[in-house]
């Protein structure tokens, strides 16, 4: 039984099977506070909110620090071991990374909502980090799944806790990587609470590189003679986050602790994601030891616009096909979460997807009623596009329920009726499981 343990408590609880990967969660604690019976971020105490840096904290009275140290310790504990809460009367575990995302990562709409699909994503990602055979995740995503923000949050979460490490970002173009860096990564860092924020060099909102290290200051006679213990003990992490232009050799020869690969299914010629992964994979290892991980996620472009190479990479990351060293062909582990798990408007106030049409309406996260299940809604949309082969094909591509849907090609690229071809492929796939077909070596009777 090939189980990856993500528990940091020394005890194992439930074992999840996510797309073929068995993952052992920690055991639930004896007492979990019920609270609101759903996820709500905790209010950041206003006495701490006004503290901007660790230096300001040091200047406070010991009595103030003693009062707030248990709160700060608890935050570090949750970051390291994950967090349990009660959600709709169910004991629910989220990883430390997921907790940091929900509680401390400011995104475009404020703090993110809790979603069950993201919980499963983070549990899978935690297993990728814990498994010494794995180089990271190859995530085939749906539109608006929040991956870019989640990856940005993980970059800051890891970088603020790592010394002497490098973090890199790639996207479908250099401009896209820069936008992710300036619009997502940097704001999350700025809004972190002081106790998670290391000393930063350079501008508050850097455009090129975010460096957690001590700014170089000129040594003067006065600074050398200073007896201020904080100045003497001043040590930065010497950790940097940056991005590179898209190219087959981006990050060649560098050592990375985390490589975020956003929009990897959209690398258009002459850039080739397969070639780049061949290069960047070596940034994550020393000899045969894996020292860094890749967080890769994308929807798939049309096959001749980068989709075909991404499909090959995804298929060579299948957990069920390992070599004798226990690794997949690419070294990554593939994950696909179908659209019905994460479709806006069909997620209830507990963050759970509403698959089937409910008998009485269910309350959404903002108090809005959900009266139709996501599957019925999806089928209704497909039904309405029956006469429009391009529209129907695009519906499957944009809102995929299977990897086959996600990797469909755009119809305008084909001389043939792709919808009919895909229908036949789906039909043939179904036949395999019906017992109508029998596979084997046949010999003629009386022949």
Where in the sequence are the language-model features?
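Phosphate/NTP-binding elements of NTP-utilizing enzymes
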Residues: 1-447
